[in-house]
Amino acid sequence: MKKSIKLAALLLISCLMLSLSGCGKVVGRYRVVETLMTQEFSIGYRENDYVRYYVDAALQTLAADGTISTLAYKWFGEDNTSFSKNINALEQVGQAAPRTMLVGVDADAFPMSYIEGDSYSGFDVELAREVCSSLGWTAKFISIKAENAYVELSSGNIDVAWGGLALEREDVKYEVTAPYLTNDIVIVTLAQGGAKTLAGLKGDTLAMTVEQKYMDALSQNEKLMERLGQIKRVSGGTQSLFDQLNSGAVNAIIVYRLALSYYG
């Protein structure tokens, strides 16, 4: 009898877990219905550029003194970064000469990097400013696309590609750090009243920003594209997407999973 009860309990738990997994993860007011793509964010430099050694040293120091963790909790609700820590790293590389560091960022990568009003903001942007402050440098941000990062570095338009960028690591002419953060591009609905599965999106309207990376992620799922009623490309960034979802103007949106911790 005890074995039968135990077996029944295990089956019940298994069924419950399968049911929950099919309904997506709920984060605050929102539900993650599907993960379309996983990205790894890295920082790119020109080969043998001394900028890397100073930036790396500053990052190790900021990781050791808790600055990076504080920023991560502010933007993500947790510290999910993987920077090396060394409180003495800046002392080991010596004093850096004053300069302006040109930082190439994806301006549509909330909450990593984005434009708010007339200025840049986001986790990567604030961290780059902290790095420059610790080095006695000034940060200047320039909008780029991940696919153009190496061209921008080679031309001298930027000194570092850093800000919501998933960089290819194949070109030996450039130096790319180990990934410091992993992110997913996901489909999100309202937790209350929204679709719980991809099947529930049949005939629905899905919105994304005008950045091509989101359409590329969606295009990998042909069955989903055929199931949707309408796909909208909207301007105004991530905030606009959540506004449209909250108002009922659209049924689902494509965003970074990291954004849910901020908006959820």
Can you annotate each of these PLM segments?
Residues L59-Q95, K213-G236:
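Ligand-binding clefts/hinges and TM-proximal coupling segments of bilobed small-molecule sensing domains
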Residues S19-G22:
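C-terminal motif of bacterial Sec signal peptides marking the signal peptidase cleavage site
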Residues L102-F110, G117-S133, L165-A166, N183-Q239, ...:
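Bilobed "Venus flytrap"/periplasmic-binding protein-like clamshell domains
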Residues W137-T138, S154-G163, D204-L206, L245-A259:
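Alpha-to-beta junction loops
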Residues V26-T38, Y45, G94, V125, ...:
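Acidic, polar ligand-binding/catalytic clefts
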Residues M1-A9:
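Bacterial N-terminal signal peptides that target proteins for export
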Residues G24, T35-T81, V125-S134, Q192-A195, ...:
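Extended ligand-binding regions for polar small-molecule ligands
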Residues Y45-Y53, L62-A63, D118-E126, S143-E147, ...:
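Soluble non-cytosolic domains of exported or imported proteins
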